[in-house]
């Protein structure tokens, strides 16, 4: 008897057959091979989109070129994806801690850019605006960063510069706009690389007014307070190469649902520590059950291969990584006596024992996942923003009898 958690597992081995699409994308050995018909493929696509939390198939406005990752935001997000995937593989937490324990990471490319540069009254500034309409509801922002690339400035030699970032709160027609301070970074004019400014404080406004973002404004000053054109300071904008264009990256975590505390009808007693359900040796009862065997010819409960190929689903125009992943599923016999290799719970042992005595009244224990892990998917949404989402409980790590 087999158990498969969630809608994805209802697809069974059909997904495994999707994995033979191209070089380097073959499913692991042992996967049955069968091509799905058009209707089956649509059903599979719909089920997987539901598991991924997507209402429909994203359709980026301009599919990326063959290189797939020419721009700054996707390149940065791919690095995050590898960090998150490496964390999952090693069952550790360093990458998760670096990502602020985020379930979802979104990047927003600069859509509109305005300058008050040379030839205008001081102070000089550069303003950036982003399409924030795709920010999801029900998610809490844990961090937000503005990233802009800096090249060495040949105009300011090696002077010290102060770069400050403000949120535009209210635009004024007859005076300077109302601004809210976000962050300040100090650097040398000869420095080169990505400058990161913390804009987390602006995230509350983004969540409340997604359709009325007035942008972020960047100022540069010397140590003596003289205003400097950001372009002369080496800060690149929309005209920079695609791999060096500015963008915002925002980290989200799903807001926890409120937990209702049950009302106690009597004073609570101190509970004894729970004992582990893991058994150090085979679960065998001596005596009359020694000769009992499971169903002949059936494999014991264990993990089997289930491969999901985004390539053969026709999704590589919006899925950046991975091109496929092994989800696995649990199947096999849970017959008495249950060996230690079956990872059986005490309840499963008892249920199997009663099943021997009353097979028509009590079913066998079920083969089901005992440990699940997350998988991450990096993709474009319909607005060409790059999304990195961690989906929990997507990969079976171990199976057992329940």
Curated annotation (Swiss-Prot):
Q: Which GO terms describe its molecular function?
A: cytokine activity; growth factor activity
Kindly give the PROSITE patterns that the UniProt entry links to this protein: TGF_BETA_1, TGF_BETA_2
What top-level branch of life does the organism fall under?
Answer: Eukaryota
Could you confirm whether the keyword Disulfide bond appears in this record? yes
Per the record, GO CC terms? extracellular space
The protein's location, in the record's own words, is: Secreted
Q: Please list which residues make up the signal peptide.
A: 1-19
* SUPFAM superfamilies registered for this protein in UniProt: Cystine-knot cytokines
Is Disulfide bond a UniProt keyword of this protein?
A: yes
GO biological process annotations for this chain's record? cartilage development; cell differentiation; diet induced thermogenesis; energy homeostasis; negative regulation of insulin secretion; ossification
Alphabetically list the UniProt keywords: Chondrogenesis, Cytokine, Developmental protein, Differentiation, Disulfide bond, Glycoprotein, Growth factor, Osteogenesis, Secreted, Signal
Q: Which residues form the propeptide?
A: 20-263
Disulfide bond residue pairs: 301-367, 330-399, 334-401
Q: Which residues are glycosylated?
A: 158, 343
Q: What does this protein do?
A: Induces cartilage and bone formation. May be the osteoinductive factor responsible for the phenomenon of epithelial osteogenesis. Plays a role in calcium regulation and bone homeostasis. Signaling protein involved in regulation of thermogenesis and energy balance. Proposed to increase the peripheral response of brown adipose tissue (BAT) to adrenergic stimulation while acting centrally in the hypothalamus to increase sympathetic output to BAT.
Q: How does it assemble?
A: Homodimer; disulfide-linked.
How is this protein named in the record? Bone morphogenetic protein 8A
Gene this protein is translated from:
BMP8A
